[in-house]
Amino acid sequence: MSKPAMRVAVTGAAGQIGYALLFRIASGEMLGKDQPVILQLLEIPDEKAQKALKGVIMELDDCAFPLLQEVTAHSDPRTAFKDADVALLVGARPRGPGMERKDLLSVNAQIFTAQGKALNDVASRNVKVLVVGNPANTNAYIAMKSAPDLPAKNFTAMLRLDHNRALSQLAAKSGKAVADIEKLVVWGNHSPTMYPDYRFATVGGQSLAKLINDDAWNRDTFIPTVGKRGAAIIEARGLSSAASAANAAIDHVRDWVLGSNGKWVTMGIPSDGSYGIPEGIIYGVPVTTENGEYKRVEGLEIDAFSRERLDFTLKELLEERDGVKDLLK
């Protein structure tokens, strides 16, 4: 007997990331090869965007995915999020020429306040929300604060792209396979301030830090390369990273829903006060996932260099939070 279909809402569905994401969800890569899905796709109520969305839906139809039960197009979050089991909030206002970061925050605060309220009112009470649209941590915080009837733990931000970028750099440096590297952590904000930390990482039970044994590389090459990778891709491609972001979103939700099999993964989640991070801030931490729940890895030692890096990315998150405080009243 087949499982009941899961409803997956995706915002910004006709955008670059959406285009790289939807076909993989429909093929079963995110929720499992035996899990039927209904896609509820949201785009802005603009004729051009809605027309583009219709084209994407035509292509989804033309793939004849056995797991794809239904696809609907929406311009209103209140219909797009109806009974959603998973919500991928991909659409956000990008930073335009001459726009200050605070302008970006206030424009996105309006979008994510409205989407948080809609989730609060119409989504499944167990909805799993992943915010991909930047600034992802603060957008997730805004949505969470706008949805008081939903558990705060349902709201997460995507740090998995940073995690995967760090994995790939470490594999290249150490000559080891990506799949063999375990216990990598990325702390903080999804921004260049984030702190990729391989002090606990292992390869085949051996310490990766001891194997690499290069503090200067860690400080001067590894951390900045991971932090500025998005900008490097824009510089090379002329467009932001879409396929790798979509891939990270698939990884994040797949592990959250189906479990990480004991492996550490990075998720931006509401802080419980551990690691000196104020409660409620959406901050990247290591977690393991099982039975649809994530559990933070606790008790990791924070040395002086790491404390400095954790506080540096926290400072940015607190500034962002304070920048949107008045908009959340």
Swiss-Prot record:
**Pfam families referenced in this protein's UniProt entry, alphabetically:** Ldh_1_C, Ldh_1_N
Molecular function as annotated in GO:
L-malate dehydrogenase (NAD+) activity
Under which name does UniProt file this protein?
Answer: Malate dehydrogenase
Q: Which catalytic residues are annotated?
A: H190 (proton acceptor)
| UniProt binding sites for NAD(+) | G12, A13, A14, G15, Q16, I17, G18, N108, Q115, V132, G133, N134
Cite the entry's keywords alphabetically.
NAD, Oxidoreductase, Tricarboxylic acid cycle
Family of the protein in this entry: Belongs to the LDH/MDH superfamily. MDH type 2 family.
Its gene is mdh
The catalytic activity of this protein is classed by the Enzyme Commission as 1.1.1.37
Catalysed reaction, written as an equation: (S)-malate + NAD(+) = oxaloacetate + NADH + H(+)
Endpoints of the signal sequence? none
The GO annotation for biological process reads:
malate metabolic process; tricarboxylic acid cycle
What function is annotated for this protein? Catalyzes the reversible oxidation of malate to oxaloacetate.
- Per UniProt, the enzyme's principal EC class comes to oxidoreductase
What broad taxonomic lineage does this protein's source fall under? Bacteria, Pseudomonadati, Pseudomonadota, Betaproteobacteria, Burkholderiales
Q: Where does substrate bind?
A: R95, R101, N134, R165
By its UniProt entry, which InterPro entries does this protein fall under? L-lactate/malate_DH, Lactate/malate_DH_C, Lactate/malate_DH_N, Lactate_DH/Glyco_Ohase_4_C, Malate_DH_type2, NAD(P)-bd_dom_sf
